Structure formats: structure tokens, C-alpha cells
């Protein structure tokens, strides 16, 4: 990273929809709903015989899909309009890799040329949550010189954001795989570690 006096313009659009907070949520945990011993034994089956326990997240898939493919194209077009950049001058659109179908539907609805975006990163790395847009950039733009790129993300909250950024002075070396030489520890060893850690013994 080098300090520069050069101005690099960025434009952001952000939004939230708190009334639909329960579409992607872990109901128990934190301060809102602290589970006790009885809650931890709770097991519920839905109409398809899927098992849910209180410490697991839940998602209303159809609602989240519809939210994603409707809000994302709108904010993509909105941030382009505010930025003053011509859409044809945006060289790459990095879209949150929720899944392949969502990414491709957003691209189609936002009329993004296929060569200017990708769902390939999802195929390689899956949905890695808050890292996914950065992963797309590192994966798809490795060692490439581009100026105008657009980032778009959406998800829990429900929330969404998009921005245009000047990428012309950014070095992108891609993704390196780091393999740790640390030995894998089993569940009991992990629990023992955290007990000792909490007690200040480690």
C-alpha cells in the first residue's frame, strides 16, 4: 500500500429492509434470545422432514431469492446513474456469489454483458459470505488492468449495497491457497481448549 494524493472517485448506494429481518436469521443466541439447556434439546421438523435445532440458522429460500434478484439489479442501475459513469465504461461487475442462479439472474435483469461478470467464483469457492465480492475480484481480475468496476452485495438484514470504484491503481495478485501445518484437533480437544482459555489456563 502506498500513499497517493491522486483522487480516486467512489460512489456508494446502501439500503436495509428491517421488516424482513427474519428471512435469514439464527433465532437463538446473542442477547435477543439466549438458549437454556431445555432449548438446546429442541428439535423441529418441517413439512419436508428437515430437522432444525435452535443453534442453527434458518433461511426462507424463496423469499431471499426473490429479494436478491429484485433489489440487486435496481441498485446496480441506481449507483451507475449517481456515479455519472456510462454503463458501457464499467469493465467488470463483481456480484455477491450467493449462488450461480442468483448471480446469473441478476446479470440478466441488469443487462450486464456475460463477459463483464462471473458466477465462476461460486463454482470454485462456494458462497463465502462477506468475502465473496473480494474473492470475485481476486479470482477474476488477477493481474488485469481495469479502471471502472462495480461491486454489488446483498443478504442478511435484509440489506444491500453497491458501489463504483476506480480500480486503475490497484494491484491484484489473485488468490493463493494457504495450507496450514497445524494438526487437526477433534471436537473434545477443541472444547477442552476453550474451557482452559476461558479459565485463563491457556
Residue ranges of predicted features:
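Short helix-to-loop capping/linker segments positioned immediately adjacent to catalytic or ligand/cofactor-binding
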Residues: 64, 79-83
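Condensing-enzyme catalytic core mediating Claisen C-C bond formation in acyl metabolism
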Residues: 1-66, 70, 74, 166-202
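Short, surface-exposed connector motifs at secondary-structure boundaries
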Residues: 84-89
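Claisen-condensing/thiolase-fold acyl-transfer catalytic domains that form or cleave C-C bonds
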Residues: 69-80, 91-202
Amino acid at each position: 500500500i502506498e500513499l497517493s494524493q491522486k483522487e480516486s472517485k467512489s460512489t456508494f448506494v446502501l439500503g436495509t429492509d428491517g421488516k424482513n429481518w427474519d428471512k435469514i436469521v439464527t433465532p437463538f443466541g446473542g442477547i435477543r434470545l439466549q438458549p437454556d439447556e431445555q432449548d438446546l434439546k429442541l428439535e423441529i421438523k418441517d413439512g419436508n422432514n428437515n430437522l432444525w435445532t435452535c443453534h442453527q440458522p434458518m433461511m426462507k429460500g424463496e423469499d431471499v431469492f426473490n429479494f436478491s434478484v429484485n433489489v440487486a439489479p435496481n441498485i446496480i442501475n441506481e449507483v451507475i446513474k449517481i456515479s455519472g459513469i456510462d454503463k458501457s465504461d464499467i469493465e467488470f461487475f463483481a456480484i455477491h456469489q450467493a449462488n450461480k442462479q442468483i448471480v446469473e439472474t441478476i446479470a440478466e435483469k441488469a443487462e450486464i454483458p456475460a463477459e463483464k461478470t462471473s458466477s465462476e467464483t461460486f463454482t470454485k469457492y462456494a458462497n463465502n459470505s462477506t468475502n465473496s465480492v473480494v474473492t470475485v475480484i481476486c479470482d477474476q481480475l488477477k493481474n488485469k488492468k481495469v479502471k471502472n468496476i462495480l461491486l454489488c452485495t446483498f443478504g442478511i438484514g435484509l440489506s444491500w449495497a453497491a458501489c463504483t470504484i476506480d480500480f486503475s491503481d490497484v494491484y491484484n495478485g489473485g488468490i493463493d491457497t494457504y495450507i496450514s501445518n497445524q494438526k487437526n484437533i477433534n471436537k473434545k480437544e477443541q472444547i477442552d481448549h476453550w474451557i482452559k482459555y476461558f479459565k485463563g489456563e491457556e
